[in-house]
């Protein structure tokens, strides 16, 4: 009986190593996506906005060349990964059915080291994301969608 429990314990421990990533790991990729690309209610959306948010989000050591922030609510962004607000796009990507208010921050100047200077471009775009387990984990691009 003791030997049977030992084998059972060994099988259980080995099985743990073969299980898929946990929900917590999936959520960490989604959380990283939000940190890099989500700002619900931006203040300004001009060059100063870009310089401030890029610094606050830790995207300036070295200076990131370009980054897009999506504005709005998380529920609408998550819905891109479902049929509610997204359609398949290219390989393993989803494109939003609706456009989002976005701000794109582009590095202006030659040095990749702080202080970073950014130029802001504000507009409305459809966004293309990669999804895992129903959550956006990578912003591929934001595009004007032709009617």
Curated annotation (Swiss-Prot):
InterPro entries: RNaseA, RNaseA-like_dom_sf, RNaseA_AS, RNaseA_domain. GO terms for molecular function: actin binding; copper ion binding; DNA binding; endonuclease activity; heparin binding; peptide binding; protein homodimerization activity; receptor ligand activity. Changing residue 46 to G: In ALS9; homodimerization is similar to wild-type; localization in the nucleus is similar to the wild-type; strongly reduces ribonucleolytic activity. The gene is ANG. The lineage of its organism: Eukaryota, Metazoa, Chordata, Craniata, Vertebrata. It is found in: Secreted; Nucleus; Nucleus, Nucleolus; Cytoplasm, Stress granule. Changing residue 68 to A: Decreased ribonuclease activity. Pfam families: RnaseA (PF00074). It is an enzyme of class 3 (hydrolase). Changing residue 20 to Q: In ALS9; uncertain significance. Changing residue 13 to A: Found in a patient with Parkinson disease; uncertain significance. It comes from Homo sapiens. SUPFAM superfamilies: RNase A-like. Secreted ribonuclease that can either promote or restrict cell proliferation of target cells, depending on the context. Endocytosed in target cells via its receptor PLXNB2 and translocates to the cytoplasm or nucleus. Under stress conditions, localizes to the cytoplasm and promotes the assembly of stress granules (SGs): specifically cleaves a subset of tRNAs within anticodon loops to produce tRNA-derived stress-induced fragments (tiRNAs), resulting in translation repression and inhibition of cell proliferation. tiRNas also prevent formation of apoptosome, thereby promoting cell survival. This is Angiogenin. A motif (Nucleolar localization signal) lies at residues 55-59.
């Amino acid at each position: 009986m003791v030997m049977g429990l030992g084998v059972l314990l060994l099988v259980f421990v080995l099985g743990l190593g073969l299980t898929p990533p946990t929900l917590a790991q999936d959520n960490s990729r989604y959380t990283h996506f939000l940190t890099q690309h989500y700002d619900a209610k931006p203040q300004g959306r001009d060059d100063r906005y870009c310089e401030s948010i890029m610094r606050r989000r830790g995207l300036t050591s070295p200076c990131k060349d370009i980054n897009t922030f999506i504005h709005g609510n998380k529920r609408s962004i998550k819905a891109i990964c479902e049929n509610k607000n997204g359609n398949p796009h290219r390989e393993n990507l989803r494109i939003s059915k609706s456009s989002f208010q976005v701000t794109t921050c582009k590095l202006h100047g030659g040095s990749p080291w702080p202080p970073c200077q950014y130029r802001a471009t504000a507009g409305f775009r459809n966004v293309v994301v990669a999804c895992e387990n129903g959550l956006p984990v990578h912003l591929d691009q934001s595009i004007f969608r032709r009617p």
